[in-house]
Every structure is written in C-alpha cells, then in structure tokens.
Amino acid sequence: MADHKGSTSKEGLSEWCILEAECSDVDNDFEQLFERDTDSDISDLLDNCDLDQGNSLELFHQQECEQSEEQLQKLKRKYLSPKAVAQLSPRLQSISLSPQQKSKRRLFAEQDSGVELTLNNEAEDVSHEVEVPAIDSRPEDEGGSGALDIDYTALLRSSNTKATLMAKFKEAFGDGFNELTRQFKSYKTCCNYWVVAAYAVHDVYESSKQLLQQHCDYIWVRSIAAITLYLLSFKAGKNRGTVHKLMTSMLNVQEQQILSEPPKLRHTAAALFWYKGGMGTGTFTYGSYPDWIAHQTILGHQSAEASTFDFSVMVQWAFDNNHFEEADIAYGYAKLAPEDANAVAWLAHNSQAKFVRECAAMVRFYKRGQMREMTMSEWIYTRINEVEGEGHWSSIVKFVRYQGINFITFLAALKDFLHSVPKRNCLLIYGPPNTGKSTFAMSLIQVLKGRVLSYVNSKSQFWLQPLGDCKIALLDDVTDPCWLYMDTFLRNGLDGHVVSLDCKYKAPMQIKFPPLLLTSNINLHEEANYRYLHSRVRGFEFPNPFPMKPDNTPEFELTDQSWKSFFARLWTQLELSDQEDEGEHGESQRAFQCSARSANEHL
C-alpha cells in the first residue's frame, strides 16, 4: 500500500490503529456542509407543542372491558358449569345419588385470529342453549302460553338432538331427564315402567290420554310448553323399540322427538317428583300409584314391619312348602317379596346367604324329627295324600301278574317288608335286562320319598349315611362286588338289629336299617357264595320284557297316582293302622308350628 502524505507508518502491534483520517474530496464542498442538518439525534427529546387528549379514554375503556370480560368468564366457570346447583332443583340436587360428569367445555376464548378461532366460536354458539339455564322465564303449564316460547327450529339446527331435547326438558320441568330415569343402552331390554318425553305433540295431546289407557295400568301425563312428559306402567313388559313405535304412531311425531328411559325405582327424590306432580292441577293421572312410588312416599303399617326380618317366619314357610335345598329356599322366598313384608326385609338384609343356609339346616332338622316320630302307616298316609290326581291300582297288579308272580305271595312279602320284620325287611327284584325292575322300584321309592344308594360311593365310609334319613331305601343294580360287601358287612343290618352307622361331621348313629329294596341281574339264591344272605333277602323274578304301546308309552302305568290308589285299596290287607285310631280319641292333630308368632296373635 502507498504511503500517505503527512503520515508515518508504524510497525509492530500498533499497525491496526489509524492515526490520521483520510481526506475526502466530498467534504470539501462548503455548500453541502452548511446545508446539512446540524441537530443531534436527541434534539427532539422535548416536545414543546400544545397537549392533545387523543384516544386515551377509548384505550382505557377497552382495558376496562377486557378486565370485566375476564372476571365474567371466571364467574361463568364457577357458577354456570354443569355442576352448578343453580341448574338443578335445590332439593333434588341435595339428595341426588347419580354421578355428575365433568365439564369439558372451554369457557375462555383463545386470543388468536384465524380459522380455528372462528370454528371454536361456532361450536360454542351451537351449545349455548345447553350451557346457560333459564332462571326466571318459565312458561305456564298446558300448552305453553307463558312469556317464553320454545324455538321449534332449535331441534333442527342442533347437531346433538338428544342434548337439545334434554335442555328443553330441563327448562320446562326444572329437573334433568337423567335425574328421573336410569339408562338402558340396549333397545331390546324389556321393562313395565317407562318415562317418555315427547316434543311438540299439542295436536294429539288430549287424545293420547284416552288411547294409552288400553295399554297401561297407570298413566301420568303433564305438558309444559312444547314438552309432554309421560310416566307409563304397561300391562306387559315392552322394550324401547316397541315403546317408540307405539308413541310415534299415537302422537304422530318422529322418533327424534322422543326421549325414553325406565324410571328410577329406588330413588326417593324421583318418586317424590311423580307423587307431588300427580297432585298438580296440570297433571292427568289414570290408575293407582305403582308399588315403587307408594312404598317410598306413602307411609303405613307395612313400613315398620318391613324394617325387621323374622327368621322363624322364613323357616315356617320352607317347612310348609317342603323346601330342603338352599337354592329352592332362596329362589322361592325371593319371589314372595312383592307381597310378603318379611321377604322384603330379607332381601334388604346383608346376610341373605347366611339366613338361607341356616333355614335349610333347620328345615332338615325338623323334617328328620317329624319322620322319626311317624310310624310307617303315618308316613305312607302322609305321602299319598300329597299326590294330586287319581290313578288305578290295577295297573300295578297287572304288571306283577304279567311277570308271572303270584300277587297274594307278593302282597304278603310287601306287608312284611313295610313293617320291617326281621330277616324280611330286604326285598330283591332280579331278572334279565329291560324287564322293568328299576322302573317298578323307582316308582315305589318316588311316591314314598325314599333314598337311593349307589355302590359307586362305596369307597367312602359315609355311603350308607342316607339310611338314617329315610323310611325306605333302594340299592339299584346290585353286582357281585356289592353282594360281597353286603355278605361281609351288612348281615346285622339285614337281620333287623341295631347297627352303628358312621355319618359325616357327626358321631356314629345307632339305628335299624329301614326297608331296603334291591334290583339285580343276579339270582342271589342260586349263588352258593352268598348262602348266608339267602335267608335274609326275599327275591322275585321279572323274566318278561317291559311291554310298550305302539306310541312308545308304557303298557302299565306305574305312576304316583297308581301307587296312591294301590295303598288306599289294599290298606287293610297290608295291615296298615287306621289313622283315626292313632289320634287321641279321634281328635284332630294340630299342624306343626316352628315360627315365633303366638297362636292367639291377631292376623
């Protein structure tokens, strides 16, 4: 680089520093120097002109509006959410048991511009009627002649028809539709009670009151503005599809104009709504109150009775109806709940299963004691009196003769068998298969309520326990292992002596074997290995096949009615005692009572 005039080049670290400014020909022009503005960059810092008000008031007004809008939105979040008590009936909300869903609606508008804000505002405008409740502007009953007129086109404009209908319902009746009903998701679930809210049915409102009477036992109808509310108790259970079909044809409306759900049957507040509403001047009712409304709103002497459960009444019912199994007791007693106050109290108890188990145990104890107290004559007389219908004893006589047996001999053996004569209390029916041995024996055991033993359980030492709980027993299809067991262990029992019977969960019992009926394909008296049983078992052979009619029905009717006629006809020949002679001078015997109620208590 060329050296400049009047400057000295420096070496070393000071090379970067310019010691003298370079001259420029542009700065030599005097006119341009004087024309140039000599003010500094901060010369306009002070403004000495007159003051002007400007738009400060408008700015302040905008700020106040924004602050007020923000406070208003906070109040909306607090008081106008779906959880607000102001939207519900205060008395109903205080005892409501239904869960409230959280509000997912966004109350603060986004401070942004563009398409998304427009879409959000449009969505808020559509759901505005659902969000804001009507406080002071309720229309009058019966036809909507009040100051507020519900917009019929809102249902068409709304994207959520059900939500709009529920909003209209709440505006009209003051209570939410879901507060009065429970939800059925399936259209096929049947129910006798239905709550129906119909929109815009003024033309056929009066006629529906009369038309529904042929379908319902109870009708509750009230119309406010454009909403008509029905509580219907149908004579037969109906599903939602059937209810909609009936109401659309009767009211001439579309299905979109109807809300239908079953009522809450165990909700006191809902029951009070229907009860108090039925007493209003604008409500039409037909029929008596349903039971679920009457029980929750009408007080009576049944209320105090239903609060306590009497276990002895349950035991007495099971004893009188011969229910021994726990399942039969539970199901049968539950069906009595609508009519029996004690059954209602049992259903409301937390220990239902405990009571059922104890009831079954007590009934078995009572029945076992009753059976042991009876003689064989009393037992047969009691059992045949429980048989309904009539039969003919000749069917049994003809069948015995068909098998080639002398009926007089058979009758004598049956007499010793029923009286448990020693070494005559075991009767064997043997023969080839398909001769009716089991059918004949089972029919006798069934009518006398005997017990059946199965040798398949012989590995258990308790397989003979049913002999202690019956008046007659059957051991069907005895084979060689069973004959060997009887020859080894049961000789004393077949002799009619007292034996020790091992029972589960109990000490061994001292009993005599009841009459024991056997069926087998083996002729015991031809087997030399069992010669010690020959004198203890009386046998009859059934050699002929069991006859059948062309329609595949038995030729001989071995039914309960036939055995009933058989014992009644041959009562004297079997030497069964007269039941009048067994009483005290012919006096009537009082029925067994196991309940705690006094005999002189008023009904």
Curated annotation (Swiss-Prot):
Pfam families: PPV_E1_C (PF00519), PPV_E1_DBD (PF20450), PPV_E1_N (PF00524). Residues 144-306 are annotated as: DNA-binding region. A motif (Nuclear export signal) lies at residues 88-97. Keywords: ATP-binding, DNA replication, DNA-binding, Early protein, Helicase, Host nucleus, Hydrolase, Isomerase, Isopeptide bond, Nucleotide-binding, Phosphoprotein, Ubl conjugation. Residues 578-603 are annotated as: Disordered. ATP binds at G431, P432, P433, N434, T435, G436, K437, S438. Residues 590-603 have a biased composition (Polar residues). One of its GO terms (cellular component) is host cell nucleus. The modification Phosphoserine is found at S81, S89. Gene3D superfamilies: 3.40.1310.10, P-loop containing nucleotide triphosphate hydrolases, Zinc finger, large T-antigen D1 domain. There is a cross-link at K512 (Glycyl lysine isopeptide (Lys-Gly) (interchain with G-Cter in SUMO)). It comes from the Viruses. It is found in: Host nucleus. It catalyses: Couples ATP hydrolysis with the unwinding of duplex DNA by translocating in the 3'-5' direction; ATP + H2O = ADP + phosphate + H(+). GO terms for molecular function: ATP binding; ATP hydrolysis activity; DNA binding; DNA helicase activity. The keyword Ribonucleoprotein does not apply. A motif (Nuclear localization signal) lies at residues 76-78. Residues 405-555 form the SF3 helicase domain. GO terms for biological process: DNA replication. It is an enzyme of class 5 (isomerase). ATP-dependent DNA 3'-5' helicase required for initiation of viral DNA replication. It forms a complex with the viral E2 protein. The E1-E2 complex binds to the replication origin which contains binding sites for both proteins. During the initial step, a dimer of E1 interacts with a dimer of protein E2 leading to a complex that binds the viral origin of replication with high specificity. Then, a second dimer of E1 displaces the E2 dimer in an ATP-dependent manner to form the E1 tetramer. Belongs to the papillomaviridae E1 protein family. This is Replication protein E1.
